[in-house]
């Protein structure tokens, strides 16, 4: 009998199992294949704060994601690395000041400590602009992170097991019953 059961050994299943086991629950995590074999192994491998959600005024969501990104960077620096991205500006899409404002918020909503801040680029003079098409003259460079997603899943599952979770791989869940 378990206090909680997780079906699926991806990042969500392993992370929830780790959290539940860490709170003292008796937990079972079962995965039909191997850990991180499904959706988690096909991710974009970014630990990002959800920059695009600022456009929909999802400030709290972005703040929470940025805070968690910082937590992950501190907890697992051996598998999470900073990455810089160049975003060419196209005046037809939105004004440069609006993009810069969004990136300013992205830099500051989560209390960023480790990553460098956004900077405005002259794409014709800045080396970062070299691979960008000539039609773009202005851009922005901002930070996010890259993660070894499979290792993150496995580390969560191992920690869950160390906290008492029973982790079963190659074990499909064929039925479950909830008992009150």
Where are these regions (language model features)?
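Extreme N-terminal leader/targeting segments of oxidoreductases
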Residues: 1-4, 19-23
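Gly/Ala-rich phosphate-binding loop of Rossmann-like dinucleotide-binding domains
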Residues: 17, 21-22, 159-161
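Dinucleotide-binding Rossmann-like beta1-alpha1 core, especially the glycine-rich loop
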Residues: 45-127
């Amino acid at each position: 009998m378990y206090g909680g059961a997780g079906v699926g050994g991806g990042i969500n299943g392993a992370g929830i199992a780790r959290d539940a086991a860490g709170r003292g629950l008796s937990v079972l995590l079962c995965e039909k294949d191997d850990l991180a074999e499904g959706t988690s192994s096909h991710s974009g491998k970014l630990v990002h704060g959800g920059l695009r959600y600022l456009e929909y005024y999802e400030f709290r969501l972005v703040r929470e994601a940025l805070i968690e990104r910082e937590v992950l960077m501190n907890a697992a620096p051996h598998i999470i690395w900073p990455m810089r991205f160049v975003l060419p500006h196209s005046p037809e899409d939105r004004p440069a000041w609006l993009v810069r404002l969004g990136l300013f918020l992205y830099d500051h909503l989560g209390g960023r400590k480790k990553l460098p801040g956004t900077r405005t680029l002259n794409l014709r003079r800045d080396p970062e602009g070299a691979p960008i098409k000539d039609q773009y003259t202005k851009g922005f460079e901002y930070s996010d992170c890259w993660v070894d997603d499979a290792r993150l899943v496995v580390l969560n599952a191992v920690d869950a097991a160390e906290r008492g979770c029973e982790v079963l791989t190659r074990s499909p869940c064929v039925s479950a019953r909830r008992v009150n």
